[in-house]
A protein has these predicted regions:
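Functionally constrained cores in energy, signaling, and assembly domains
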Residues: 8, 16, 275
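Short low-complexity stretches enriched in small and charged residues
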Residues: 11-16, 86-90
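N-terminal catalytic cores of NTP/NDP-binding nucleotidyl/phosphoryl-transfer enzymes
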Residues: 1-13
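N-terminal capping/interface segment
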Residues: 1-3, 23, 31
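A glycine-rich helix N-cap at a beta->alpha junction
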Residues: 15, 19-29
Length: 335
């Protein structure tokens, strides 16, 4: 969702999940993962439903809230001039409208994602099949910038601490994490792409609309010195930083609208790791999933079914200076 490279690759994260007790680990594909919260949640619920889960558990700042009931009162603010006149962002208008209907003001990051999961469960008519359960987010807020004295920290704080050379072993089960100056490498790749692509090429990229291509082109022509300056030159009230991060990644990977739509129409389950219990579950459910399960990737699969994820993996390795492949010939972790 952040539109930024993960600080360590999916295989190390999958191993950490297995070590922590997970029996099956699947990758949320790029076309659902690098998205706004609503599409992220819709995609996750779609895949988890096909895997026949009975519950989805997520963190929330207000774990006592019934998010399914809250989502059932989703407001429609389209064409509502009372909100339009207040010159607020869509998110602020939406939260205000929801508060008018329910008394709850939706503003915290994890609450918003839990609400998105609830909407996805409702929209896909899964309330009888999947229960949404939330656990309280404690000790660290999503946006916290600094490590605290306990053993729980936000991902933002962990990233920042790593960039400053601090040890974060007590805050994550993944030991020996190394910080890579991904912003500098990401910026160099982006600078080349944005300098050589014309307006038409940028306009054809997924999620580039409302004249955003002009803002982006004007920004790069001002010769920004780094990634942060590039973002500042593009930023406006209309676009969040997360939205801009994602769009710049789409541009870097040259992902067109039709490519993204085609990928979403052909979902799959990418298996990253399993235990014996997980293997037994897959064996019991064999032939009962609608979407294919991919455990081994050859060049043909990489170029076809996994085209976007494969390309993202190649660029990720360049940015993070990883030598091992992310996809070709990689097999699921077994425990």
């Amino acid at each position: 969702q952040r539109g930024l490279p993960a600080i360590t690759d999916k295989w190390k994260r999958a191993q950490a999940a297995i070590d922590a007790g997970a029996d099956l680990v699947f990758e949320l594909p790029f076309y659902y993962a690098v998205q706004a919260g609503e599409i992220f949640a819709q995609g996750a619920v779609r895949l988890l439903s096909d895997l026949q889960v009975s519950s989805i558990i997520c963190g929330s700042e207000h774990a006592d809230i019934d998010f399914i009931n809250l989502a059932a009162h989703e407001p429609d603010i389209s064409g509502n001039s009372n909100f339009d006149k207040k010159n607020r962002t869509f998110a602020s208008n939406y939260a205000a409208a929801l508060e008018e209907k329910t008394g709850f003001y939706l503003e915290n990051a994890n609450d918003i994602l839990a609400f998105s999961y609830a909407k996805a469960i409702l929209n896909q008519n899964l309330t009888e099949k999947i229960k949404l359960r939330t656990i309280s987010r404690v000790s660290a807020d999503y946006h916290d910038q600094f490590l605290n004295d306990g053993e729980i920290a936000s991902a933002t704080a962990i990233r920042k601490a790593l960039s400053e050379g601090q040890n974060v072993d007590s805050y994550t089960p993944m030991s020996d994490l190394q910080y890579t100056d991904y912003e500098a490498r990401l910026f160099q790749l982006l600078k080349y792409r944005l300098s050589t692509d014309g307006l038409g090429q940028i306009r054809s990229i997924y999620q580039v609309n409302e004249g955003m291509e002009y803002l982006i082109k004007q920004a790069i022509e001002k010769n920004p010195s780094d990634f942060g300056e590039l973002l500042a030159l593009i930023k406006s009230k209309r676009y969040t930083f997360a939205r801009l991060h994602r769009v710049l990644v789409y541009i870097l990977l040259n992902i067109k609208v039709d490519q993204m739509n085609l990928a979403m129409q052909n979902p799959y389950h990418r298996l990253l790791g399993f235990t014996e219990k997980g293997r037994q579950y897959l064996h019991e459910k064999k032939g009962r999933f609608n979407f294919p399960t991919i455990s081994h990737v050859d060049q043909k699969t990489a170029n076809k079914s996994l085209a976007i994820d494969y390309k993202a993996g190649l660029v990720y390795n360049q940015i993070m200076d990883y030598k091992s492949t992310q996809d070709i010939k990689r097999t699921p972790i077994q425990s």
